[in-house]
């Protein structure tokens, strides 16, 4: 089974706040992002990470579409409730940045209509 985690405490400082996909059956981990020491998509054995504490990150994995052999995975590291709370209480989330059509933008700089649209598009249950 594959699960997503964010490392919150580790003996290795390069792991702090990094995001990983763990495959416990294969004993492997894939780096999604880290401040340093690990490259994006780098695969390592789980025991190479050493001692760490983490929090689970919900994975939203939809069936991928193959186009000329390519695949796409969209990993959302926010919950719907977080964005809805940011709409109601923008002062609590001044640094909340999202990605829209390849551009990074502060969520609070969007109009209320755009914010609702982002929430609706990001957290669909079915097509």
From Swiss-Prot:
Pfam family, any one: Gly_radical
Gene3D superfamilies referenced in this protein's UniProt entry, alphabetically: 3.20.70.20
Cellular component annotations (GO), alphabetically ordered: cytosol
UniProt GO molecular function: formate C-acetyltransferase activity
Keywords per UniProt: Organic radical
Domain Glycine radical: 5-127
PROSITE patterns found in the cross-reference section: GLY_RADICAL_1 (PS00850), GLY_RADICAL_2 (PS51149)
Entries under InterPro entries matching the protein: Auton_GlycylRad_Cofactor, Form_AcTrfase_GR_CS, Gly_radical, Glycyl_radical_cofactor_GrcA
Residue numbers carrying Glycine radical: 102
Cross-referenced NCBIfam families: spare_glycyl
UniProt function note: Acts as a radical domain for damaged PFL and possibly other radical proteins.
PANTHER family the UniProt entry points to: FORMATE ACETYLTRANSFERASE, FORMATE ACETYLTRANSFERASE 1
Descriptive protein name: Autonomous glycyl radical cofactor
Annotated source species: Edwardsiella ictaluri (strain 93-146)
């Amino acid at each position: 089974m594959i699960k997503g985690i964010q490392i919150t405490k580790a003996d290795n400082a390069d792991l702090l706040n990094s995001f990983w996909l763990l495959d416990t059956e294969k004993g492997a981990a894939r780096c999604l992002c880290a401040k340093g020491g690990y490259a994006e998509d780098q695969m390592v054995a789980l025991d190479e990470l050493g001692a760490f504490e983490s929090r689970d990150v919900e994975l939203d994995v939809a069936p991928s579409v193959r186009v000329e052999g390519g695949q796409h995975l969209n990993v959302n590291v926010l919950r719907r409730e977080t964005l809805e709370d940011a709409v109601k209480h923008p002062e609590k989330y001044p640094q909340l940045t999202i990605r829209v059509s390849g551009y990074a933008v502060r969520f609070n700089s969007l109009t209320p209509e755009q914010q609702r649209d982002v929430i609706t598009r990001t957290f669909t249950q079915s097509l």
